[in-house]
Amino acid sequence: MLKKTLLGLTAGALLLNASSALAANYKIDIPGQHAFIGFRIQHLGYSWLYGTFKDFDGSFTFDEQNPAENKVNVTIKIASLDTNHAERDKHLRSKDYFNTEKYPEAKFTSTEVKKEGEKYVVTGDLTLNGVTKPVILNAELMGEGKDPWGGYRAGFEASGKIKLKDFNFKADLGPKSQEADLLISIEGVREK
């Protein structure tokens, strides 16, 4: 009886370890520019203003069969902000908005990943402008597989919202400009 119990426990431990082994680590493909982190916000309620961050780095762990093992970590250099207008970008880097002299980086670290149907709900801590708050991103696996260079890739699209007042933005552009939409598209190369 003791032998059967020990064998059962050993087999169970091996199965648990095997499912954890399916989780793969990916580096976001920044060198190949197969990644985008941006935002949009209403400008005075009349139009959408789009911006992007050109300098960021990160990684993720992905296991389609065990979403609880999935993790995301991203660091953004806020001064790399680009809205296609140099004067506006300078103003957005100021104390009224991102305050890049005092807070040069933003960081997102996931705390939980859940699969809901074909999509993923990624909850994490966003540190921006000296404040850390939970943020929810809705993500979708765009695809995964071997690439022509001998690697293996996985790509995701994600979106979410943040309230500007939650992150100490000082300027107020009216009631329709209180939230920003986050727009993310990343492709990761599996680490060997």
Curated annotation (Swiss-Prot):
Q: Which InterPro entries match?
A: Lipid/polyisoprenoid-bd_YceI, TTHA0802/YceI-like_sf, UPF0312/YceI
Keywords, comma-separated and alphabetical: Periplasm, Signal
> Which residues, if any, are the signal sequence?
1-23
Any one cellular component term from GO for this entry?
A: periplasmic space
Q: Which SMART domains match?
A: YceI
Note one Pfam family from the annotation: YceI
Q: Where in the cell is it found?
A: Periplasm
- Primary location class: periplasm
The similarity annotation says: Belongs to the UPF0312 family. Type 1 subfamily.
Protein name per the record: UPF0312 protein plu2095
